[in-house]
């Protein structure tokens, strides 16, 4: 819907001077002016895409049905107490302006130039934000994806295809006739090997494809575009998995002839490394019997005692008020720095290994910390699991959303008063 904000003609121009109700929707109504404005927006959007418009009566009914379902979601938002603050709305408007490479003021001017008021645009954005939050509460938060579902997806052909890396390939095909005898096959094999040797000696792959390949993409230098690694047939799937960008395969026999592939680029599927830090800390918090100043003094005292030779772990067990680590001598074990609050992360980043930090403050209280080690770990498998989780959640969300929208529509009282439409009361 937000794309309609930049239509070349004012949507308001379609609004009739005399308004009337075109649908009763539970405790609210849809007005003719709302319908006319949205129909005009849809017409403009379809025209920009070069598509054909359905008959006016059909389009009116389709758009009205969409407005009815939107209205029902807005009523749910109202009953649920969902409110969009001015600050949130301003931030959303600013984000939309930024996506269109505009400042907020340029965005306002562009709307005015296209005949749409800034106030109407803000209201439309507000409605969409309310609907988004309603869907989040009623649909998205109820979706569960089990570990077994993730494992099954990763093991499936579909999962392997969707999560595999993509390869940008070029090919050269030295053909063999369909009923070729052994001599013709050997001749093609020799030519393929000659081409391969020239490529290994530095010949340009694109030029060699134009001159020698029988593939239908020969004139494009053999460019095959991007292909999913999981979709490639043997033996290329195995060979390409270990190749670097720029590498060339040896000629391989296929039903159509001998093929040579060049790996131009690859994306996705790479190993993903994550930095981890082994750290321990002592946390002391202000309380009704110990104010901020006294808490800071205690942290400084603990720092001094550790520097003087007392055992960090024993002091953590006695004084630390972090219930998750105190019993372990303050040890947080290996942890992703991004899981920590910014102040803690910043001190940890600049602390040399084995050296105690000076007391510092976060939202939780006063800390002293010591970095025990740093390492980079391969998080590729965790990243794949997270990708699979996202794919499965999105799939379930799409299904659940459509089911929920049908449900709220079926359960609502709707009386359509649009001329020419089927009169319905539910």
Curated annotation (Swiss-Prot):
It comes from the Bacteria. Its EC number is 5.2.1.8. Its main location: periplasm. PROSITE patterns: PPIC_PPIASE_2. GO terms for molecular function: peptide binding; peptidyl-prolyl cis-trans isomerase activity; unfolded protein binding. SUPFAM superfamilies: FKBP-like, Triger factor/SurA peptide-binding domain-like. Transmembrane segments: none annotated. Chaperone involved in the correct folding and assembly of outer membrane proteins. Recognizes specific patterns of aromatic residues and the orientation of their side chains, which are found more frequently in integral outer membrane proteins. May act in both early periplasmic and late outer membrane-associated steps of protein maturation. The PPIase activity resides only in the second parvulin domain. The N-terminal region and the C-terminal tail are necessary and sufficient for the chaperone activity of SurA. The PPIase activity is dispensable for SurA to function as a chaperone. The N-terminal region and the C-terminal tail are also required for porin recognition. This is Chaperone SurA.
């Amino acid at each position: 819907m937000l794309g309609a904000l930049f239509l070349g003609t004012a949507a308001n121009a379609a609004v009739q001077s005399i308004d009337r109700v075109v649908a009763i929707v539970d405790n609210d109504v849809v007005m003719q002016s709302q319908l006319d404005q949205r129909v005009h927006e849809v017409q403009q959007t379809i025209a920009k895409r070069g598509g054909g418009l359905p008959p006016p009566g059909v389009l009116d009914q389709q758009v009205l049905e969409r407005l009815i379902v939107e209205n029902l979601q807005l009523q749910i938002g109202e009953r649920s107490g969902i409110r969009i603050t001015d600050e949130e709305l301003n931030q959303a408007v600013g984000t939309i302006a930024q996506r269109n490479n505009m400042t907020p003021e340029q965005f306002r001017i562009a709307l005015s130039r296209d005949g749409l008021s800034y106030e109407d645009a803000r209201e439309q954005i507000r409605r969409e934000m309310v609907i988004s939050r309603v869907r989040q509460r009623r649909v998205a938060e109820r979706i569960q994806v089990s570990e077994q579902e993730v494992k099954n997806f990763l093991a499936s052909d579909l999962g392997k295809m969707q999560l595999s890396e993509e390869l940008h390939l070029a090919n050269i095909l030295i053909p063999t006739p369909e009923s070729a005898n052994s001599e013709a096959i050997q001749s093609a094999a020799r030519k393929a090997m000659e081409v391969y040797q020239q490529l290994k000696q530095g010949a340009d792959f694109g030029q060699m494809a134009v001159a020698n390949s029988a593939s239908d993409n020969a004139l494009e230098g053999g460019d095959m575009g991007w292909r999913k690694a999981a979709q490639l047939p043997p033996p290329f799937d195995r060979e390409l998995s270990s190749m670097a960008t720029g590498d060339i395969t040896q000629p391989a026999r296929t039903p159509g002839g001998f093929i040579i592939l060049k790996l131009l680029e690859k994306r996705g599927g790479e190993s993903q490394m994550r930095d981890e830090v082994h750290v321990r800390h002592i946390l002391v918090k202000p309380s009704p019997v110990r104010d901020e100043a006294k808490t800071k003094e205690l942290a400084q005292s603990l720092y001094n005692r550790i520097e003087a030779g007392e055992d960090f772990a024993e002091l953590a067990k006695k004084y630390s008020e972090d219930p998750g680590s105190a019993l372990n001598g303050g040890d947080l074990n290996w942890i992703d720095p991004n899981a920590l609050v910014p102040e803690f992360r910043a001190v940890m980043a600049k602390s040399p290994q084995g050296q105690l930090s000076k007391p510092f403050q976060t939202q939780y209280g006063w800390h002293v910390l010591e970095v025990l080690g740093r390492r980079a770990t391969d998080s590729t498998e965790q990243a794949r699991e997270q990708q699979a989780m996202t794919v499965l959640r999105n799939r379930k969300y799409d299904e659940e959303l459509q089911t929920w929208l049908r449900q709220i529509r079926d359960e609502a009282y709707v009386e359509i008063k649009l001329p020419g439409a089927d009169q319905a009361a539910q």
